[in-house]
Amino acid sequence: MELTGVIAQSIFDDNAADLKLSWVAGLEGADRAFDVDFAKEATSAADLVGHLNLIHPNRIQVLGKPEITYYQRLSEENRKRQMGELILLEPPFLVVADGVDPPPDLELRCTRSSTPLFTSPISSAAVIDHLRLYLSRISAPRVTMHGVFLDILGMGVLIMGDSGLGKSELGLELISRGHGLVADDAVDFVRLGPDFIEGRCPPLLQNLLEVRGLGLLDIKTIFGETAVRRKMKIKLIVQLVRRNDGEFERLPLDSQYLDVLGLPIHMVKIQVAAGRNLAVLVEAAVRNTILRLRGIDTLRDFMDRQRAAMQAEAASHSPQGRLL
């Protein structure tokens, strides 16, 4: 997993409010990070954080009430040996959860070794789940794509095309028809799972849509709260093409896809020409995609129907068919 720039300080700052974290020791270790080789070998966030485990000392160690109880039952010699082995390998930080006070000797050892020690009143299981989700998100593959990302009929749709084809104008028309804006111009996509990619708007461009001749429009202010979305999963890409595009197929026999972060996303191409109602065409493409996801393929059904008709006609013209 890629965790460049992820240090104890940034993790604390991003999660302190949600987990009610307090930094009680090891303030000098604010720049402590995951071991590079360990992070590269990790296949998921579950490898990066968990309950106290001396076999995997390089991950974030979370100590709940059972772990602290076990620690306090150890002899002083065993405490020094086990914690010494753990801290020697420099875990990113330790978290004492369940509202338990960290043992004084553990706090002192963290201070001397500059190992960050956090406390949280939240249960250790909840702390682990939250940190795993956080690490999954910040280490997930991501890319920024150019276009207008919309929520159309509950489906995330990215409208792409060359400059000057009217992507933003089309987006404005769709918003006026009751659909929602996620992002304009630059869309940040993150692959959060094996089969879905989430798109968001960069904070700087939140709620804004640029239309030639009108400038920047604040969609939330103009159309209201329901006209914007914070995030959507991308399911369809609409590629706007010029009328003289020689690669355009009027009736494509095979579905078209565009690779986004290693995941094929269904794509349709729409020609831009005077008099064409692009908003209606995009809505129809979305409805057709919804049917395809439900297993209904209109083109395939038509081809099956045509094949059956041709076979019936061929049978009627055969000698055996005429005898019948």
From Swiss-Prot:
Mg(2+) binds at residues 168, 210. GO terms for molecular function: ATP binding; magnesium ion binding; phosphorelay sensor kinase activity; protein serine/threonine kinase activity; protein serine/threonine/tyrosine kinase activity. The active site is at residues 146, 167, 185, 250. SUPFAM superfamilies: HprK N-terminal domain-like, PEP carboxykinase-like. Residues 271-276 are annotated as: Important for the catalytic mechanism of dephosphorylation. It comes from Ralstonia pickettii (strain 12J). InterPro entries: HPr(Ser)_kin/Pase (IPR003755), Hpr_kin/Pase_C (IPR011104), Hpr_kin/Pase_Hpr_N (IPR011126), P-loop_NTPase (IPR027417), Ser_kin/Pase_Hpr-like_N_sf (IPR028979). The gene is hprK. Keywords: ATP-binding, Kinase, Magnesium, Metal-binding, Multifunctional enzyme, Nucleotide-binding, Serine/threonine-protein kinase, Transferase. Catalyzes the ATP- as well as the pyrophosphate-dependent phosphorylation of a specific serine residue in HPr, a phosphocarrier protein of the phosphoenolpyruvate-dependent sugar phosphotransferase system (PTS). HprK/P also catalyzes the pyrophosphate-producing, inorganic phosphate-dependent dephosphorylation (phosphorolysis) of seryl-phosphorylated HPr (P-Ser-HPr). This is HPr kinase/phosphorylase.
